Design a protein with these regions (language model features):
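A short, polar/charged loop-to-alpha-helix boundary motif
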Residues: 93-95, 138-139
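A short acidic, helix-capping loop that chelates divalent metal ions and anchors anionic groups
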Residues: 78, 136-142
Length: 209
């Protein structure tokens, strides 16, 4: 199984709704240049042309700052770039099919919501990381499954690959993970609305040392 040291720290994800292309571009470079290791491109409600343009911008910035880029549920886009990974949700393509298309040298992450069984299956089938959440109520998704911190404590007993948490996480509640210490913490509005993204990265680095 491919291991990558960049599967750690704050894991920003693009919001579904952008105020404007200009504001997205401005905040995007701030975030990618803030010291993160990994970034996810996740845009589901745009034209193909606009999605490709924003992806190209994101890709170039990730190359510039040596940040691992993950594409959410778009294997057609992912297979055209040898150096990007793929994140798979519950109703998306399964990991076996993704591996056949992308090969064994790509990073593939799996959403497990609050299911230890899903995580064990993902690990057994070659996932590089698993994601749990929503950890808190969130406005980023209309429908979500809450995951308790107790589930994470149990997960850490059985899962050897990196663990990510997501959902409603911000600079105020991020410290609730001090004890559990997940490998990655995904943030959407929690970092895209932050004036100084490096502040969030510093908090994560402090308790994950």
């Amino acid at each position: 199984m491919l291991k990558d040291s960049r599967l750690s720290g704050i894991y920003p994800i693009t919001p579904d709704v952008l105020l404007s292309d200009l504001s997205y571009e401005e905040v995007l470079e701030k975030i990618i240049a803030s010291g993160i290791n990994i970034f996810q491109f996740r845009i589901k409600s745009m034209s193909i042309r606009k999605t490709r343009r924003l992806f190209s911008l994101t890709y170039d910035l990730c190359i510039k700052y040596n940040v691992l880029l993950i594409i959410n549920n778009n294997i057609e886009l992912a297979k055209n770039f040898d150096d990007v990974g793929l994140h798979i949700g519950d109703s998306d393509i399964n990991i076996s099919e993704a591996r056949k298309i992308l090969g064994n040298n790509r990073i593939i992450g799996i959403s497990c919501y609050n299911s230890i069984e899903k995580a064990l299956n993902a690990q057994a089938n070659g996932a590089n990381y698993v994601s749990f959440g929503s950890m808190f109520p969130t406005k980023s998704k209309k429908r979500y499954t809450l995951c308790s911190h107790d589930v994470l404590e149990e997960v850490k007993k059985h899962i050897k690959i990196p663990i990510c948490v997501i959902g409603g996480i911000n600079h105020e509640n991020i410290k609730s993970f001090n004890k559990i210490k997940p490998d990655m913490i995904s943030m959407i509005s929690g970092i895209f609305s932050e004036q100084k993204p490096s502040k969030i990265v510093t908090i994560m680095n402090t308790f994950n040392e």
